[in-house]
């Protein structure tokens, strides 16, 4: 079976064939200068139509033709009835061209593609191996991750999985803020308390989060401590830039608290099925940041204020607020080091993707402006902004210690998953340990799906019941896969040859049509940086399979050829579902 005759994207190939036929028909009768747009409606309201196009309606005025007559001419001249995969073409209403696909041929094409490509089905060569750096999560290492960080991590992780799947050379990075004021507060408190060890059984990020909260309270009560912390920060930066040995004790405190918090973050992210390829430290760019400041001063675009601080005016970029590059004592700020970090990334990748909270929009505008001043193309930085998650429990604040940690959130999800399983009678025959494992995977799938299915630019009003619903949430998708695997286990037979002509009932064909669109949804997710596109597709696919499962018998069919064809359809669904769930990071469960 040659790859040339087995398309990676059967639906798009079919659409292209139909569009070409329609364009050729129009060009053969009318003089049209430009490439004709042929919009396709994938959900036409006409009974019996799988696709439709209003192309005649949009062209009629330009060609001075009656739209219905134009549509009939297009159908007649294009011989759409003879186009491969099209069974019938006809005109309805004022000029809509409706198309019914040849179910047998289209089913054969789609299933051939799924079985030929297997675990690669859905993957298109969008990236052509080009190097990309994708940065996500990058939470301050001064306490545990909270659910907002979880949204960042899930969005970034799904985009990374999809970009790797579509042949981008992706390196996933976590930018570690190891020299900001918050870390200085934590390092100061750590030294003050005598460098305490993390108690056995306690996560390091939780322990240091408590220390940080205590430090914040002490500084709030005694504002003079602010200067002590500032001295800590200045000493650490001098250590990094000038290798000043007298600050080794302070530097060691900074590095210890950062590494310990980061260790806790990694544990949480692993549970959420999120991984990073590289951890890049802000402190690595302390010297580079100073060089950038000098360069901007030499270029005449930055200036030193009377108090000694260096600033750059961004009014030419429509930004009223000037950007401060250094403090009056000459030390750099996070923004300056972030500029250095992005220059470093751009030197190593075709383009960069950053996943950031919506509150970073001004900072990104400033970053783009300075990069443009430095003659770097800011369009090579693609930023995915996301809004916040609102929990029933209320707001989160790492500063005062009032927040819901991501660990607590995942534990709550697991507890509720166990309760849902018990209420639904799921996995009753299994041991407590096995049920715990299934509950954990249901919880992770539920949380990831609940985050993924909402467009990043919209806030999430988190609903526990909906997230863990076996009819709407992540478990709904896992259950579809488990049902399919159950059918194949019970059948206990290997089907090598089958006739797709036996898959012509409405429910089977709807499932086939839905599966044929998987590659296109992956591509849209990557191009638009929208995990919600893929998540919604996953829900629709699962819903279609559940309907098929309930309406179409597979195991108890007298006709062997029908049974074999339906078994292959179920097997094809497990391939698509597993590929899809892997991209979304949703655990696959063979039994539920």
UniProtKB/Swiss-Prot annotation:
Positions occupied by motif 'HIGH' region: 139-149
Top-level class of the enzyme under EC nomenclature: ligase
Taxonomic classification: Archaea, Methanobacteriati, Methanobacteriota, Methanomada group, Methanopyri
Listed GO MF terms: arginine-tRNA ligase activity; ATP binding
Gene Ontology BP terms: arginyl-tRNA aminoacylation
Entry-linked PANTHER family: ARGININE--TRNA LIGASE, CYTOPLASMIC (PTHR11956:SF5), ARGINYL-TRNA SYNTHETASE (PTHR11956)
UniProt-listed Pfam families: Arg_tRNA_synt_N, DALR_1, tRNA-synt_1d
Catalytic reaction annotation: tRNA(Arg) + L-arginine + ATP = L-arginyl-tRNA(Arg) + AMP + diphosphate
Cited InterPro entries: aa-tRNA-synth_I_CS, Arg-tRNA-ligase, Arg-tRNA-synth_N, Arg-tRNA-synth_N_sf, ArgRS_core, DALR_anticod-bd, Rossmann-like_a/b/a_fold, tRNAsynth_Ia_anticodon-bd
Gene3D superfamilies: Arginyl tRNA synthetase N-terminal domain, HUPs, Isoleucyl-tRNA Synthetase, Domain 1
UniProt keyword terms in alphabetical order: Aminoacyl-tRNA synthetase, ATP-binding, Cytoplasm, Ligase, Nucleotide-binding, Protein biosynthesis
Family: Belongs to the class-I aminoacyl-tRNA synthetase family.
Keyword tRNA-binding among record annotations: no
Disulfide bonds: none
Compartments reported by the entry: Cytoplasm
Gene: argS
Record's protein name: Arginine--tRNA ligase
SUPFAM superfamilies listed in its UniProt record: Anticodon-binding domain of a subclass of class I aminoacyl-tRNA synthetases, Arginyl-tRNA synthetase (ArgRS), N-terminal 'additional' domain, Nucleotidylyl transferase
EC number: 6.1.1.19
Example of a GO cellular component annotation carried by this entry: cytoplasm
């Amino acid at each position: 079976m040659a790859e040339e005759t087995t398309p990676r994207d059967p639906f798009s190939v079919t659409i292209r064939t139909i569009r070409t036929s329609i364009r050729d028909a129009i060009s053969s009768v009318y003089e049209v200068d430009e490439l004709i747009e042929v919009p396709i409606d994938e959900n036409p309201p006409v009974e019996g139509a799988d696709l439709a196009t209003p192309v005649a309606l949009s062209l009629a005025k330009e060609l001075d033709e009656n739209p219905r007559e134009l549509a009939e001419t297009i159908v007649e001249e294009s011989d759409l009835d003879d186009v491969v995969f099209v069974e019938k073409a006809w005109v309805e209403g004022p000029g809509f061209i409706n198309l019914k696909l040849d179910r047998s041929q289209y089913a054969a094409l789609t299933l051939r593609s799924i079985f030929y490509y297997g675990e690669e089905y859905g993957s298109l060569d969008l990236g052509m191996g080009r190097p990309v750096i994708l940065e996500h999560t990058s939470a301050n290492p001064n306490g545990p991750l909270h659910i907002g960080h979880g949204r960042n991590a899930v969005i970034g992780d799904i985009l990374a999985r999809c970009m790797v799947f579509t042949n981008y050379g992706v390196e996933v990075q976590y930018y570690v803020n190891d020299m900001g004021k918050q870390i200085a507060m934590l390092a100061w408190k750590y030294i003050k308390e005598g460098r305490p060890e993390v108690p056995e059984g306690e996560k390091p990020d939780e322990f240091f989060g408590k220390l940080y909260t205590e430090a914040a309270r002490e500084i709030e009560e005694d504002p003079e401590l602010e200067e002590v912390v500032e001295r800590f920060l200045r000493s650490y930066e001098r250590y990094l830039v000038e290798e000043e040995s007298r600050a080794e004790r302070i530097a060691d405190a900074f590095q210890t608290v950062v590494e310990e918090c980061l260790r806790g973050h990694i544990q949480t992210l692993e549970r959420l099925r999120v991984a990073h390829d590289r951890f890049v430290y802000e402190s690595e760019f302390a010297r580079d940041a100073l060089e950038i400041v000098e360069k901007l001063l030499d270029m005449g675009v930055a200036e030193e204020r009377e108090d000694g601080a260096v600033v750059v005016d961004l009014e030419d970029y429509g930004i009223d607020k000037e950007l401060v590059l250094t403090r009056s004592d000459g030390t750099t700020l996070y923004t300056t080091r972030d500029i250095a970090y992005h220059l470093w990334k751009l030197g190593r990748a075709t383009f960069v993707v950053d996943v950031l909270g919506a509150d970073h929009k001004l900072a990104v505008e400033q970053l783009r402006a300075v990069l443009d001043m430095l003659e770097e193309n800011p369009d090579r930085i693609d930023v995915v902004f996301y809004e916040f998650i609102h929990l029933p429990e209320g707001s989160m604040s790492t500063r005062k210690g009032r927040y819901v940690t991501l660990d607590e959130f995942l534990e709550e999800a697991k507890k509720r998953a166990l309760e849902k399983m018990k209420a639904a009678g799921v996995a009753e025959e299994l041991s407590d340990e096995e049920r715990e494992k299934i509950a954990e995977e249901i919880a992770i799938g539920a949380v990831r799906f609940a985050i993924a299915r909402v467009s990043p630019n919209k806030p999430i009003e988190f609903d526990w019941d909906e997230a863990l619903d076996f009819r709407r949430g992540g478990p709904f998708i896992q259950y579809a896969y488990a049902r399919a695997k159950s059918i194949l286990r019970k059948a206990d037979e290997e089907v090598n040859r089958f006739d797709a002509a036996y898959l012509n009932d409405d429910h089977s064909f709807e499932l086939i049509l839905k599966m044929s669109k998987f590659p296109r949804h992956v591509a849209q997710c990557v191009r638009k940086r929208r995990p919600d596109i893929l998540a919604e597709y996953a829900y629709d696919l699962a819903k279609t399979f559940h309907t098929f499962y309930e309406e179409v018998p597979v195991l108890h069919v007298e006709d062997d050829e029908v049974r074999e064809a339906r078994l292959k359809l179920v097997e094809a669904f497990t391939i698509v579902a597993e590929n899809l769930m892997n991209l979304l990071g949703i655990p696959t469960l063979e039994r539920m």
